Amino acid sequence: APALYGIIGAYRKGHILFVSADESGFLDVGTPNTQLTWMNVQINGRPVTPRNGHPVEIEALWYNTLALAHHIALQRKDPDPCSAKELAAMRTVFRKRFLLPDGSLRDVWRSEEDGGPDNSVRPNQLFAAALPFPVLEPEKAEGVVKIAREKLLTPFGLRTLSPDDPAFCPDYAGSPAERGRSYHQGTVWPWLLGVYADALFKTTEAVSAGKRTVMSGVVTDFLNTISPLFTRHLSESCLGHISEIFSGTEPWAPHGSIAKAWSEAGVYRAL
């Protein structure tokens, strides 16, 4: 617990390079020239997917860190690093900043003076529905999962960008710069299946009050969707292993590393 409290304090005091806490308690991350999230490609020193400001998954993870610390502090009778009242206020801020009319979440929130928000439909929003301490109510989290299922889910993982987006680039091919431009702009990543499954099952259980028939149907549909990952892919690239990425459209060609640890870990977690 002391280590966790110390980490929180370091972020709040601005001791982490390019990271600071704002007046709402959330984290302001990076600059226009830095890439501090997993979507980290730069070409000639410029980010391909600029995500400075308030990336949705960073804020969801940070909220969970504070909520966990609050839970531990209550159990240990320690000074509370983030009270229940503060957490409730953060949930309100999160909804106001990120929730869009169609039920999806912004990928990045920024103030207008900092360039304005990024409303791209990406899988990062699933972290807000998947983590143990929910920053969204189940009904709103259900909308996030619905958008991901309709726009991002494929038989081999989740797209990094909706095909409806003008910047969608599904083919990972060409020069290093050309591949870099598509790496997080539409290619499919299997590791995201773990996050999707967490969000799907957690949300379905909450909304359906744990009804076994509903849960069984959701699990069956999910497994049917991703079955080609096992019936086809495990014998087409590196025998018995899962590739790093796939094309964002059919025929879902595998690319990148032919046996990727995080792909396999994410898929195994989903199962």
What are these regions (language model features)?
Residues 1, 52-59, 80, 84, ...:
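Amphipathic, non-membrane alpha-helical segments in soluble helical-bundle scaffolds
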Residues 1-41, 55-59, 63, 189-203, ...:
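Aromatic-rich carbohydrate-recognition surfaces in CAZymes
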Residues 9-12, 16-23, 28, 61-172, ...:
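Catalytic cores of carbohydrate-active enzymes
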Residues 32-54, 111-113, 172-183, 244-254:
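Acidic/His metal-coordination segments adjacent to aromatic residues that form catalytic metal sites
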Residues 54-57, 122-129, 178-191, 197, ...:
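Substrate-binding groove/exosite segments of carbohydrate-active enzymes
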Residues 74-81, 142, 199-220:
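Acidic, serine/threonine/proline-rich low-complexity intrinsically disordered regions
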Residues 116, 179-188, 201-214, 254-259:
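Short, contiguous acidic/charged loop-to-helix segments that flank catalytic cores in large enzymes
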Residues 158-193:
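Generic long, charged, amphipathic alpha-helical segments
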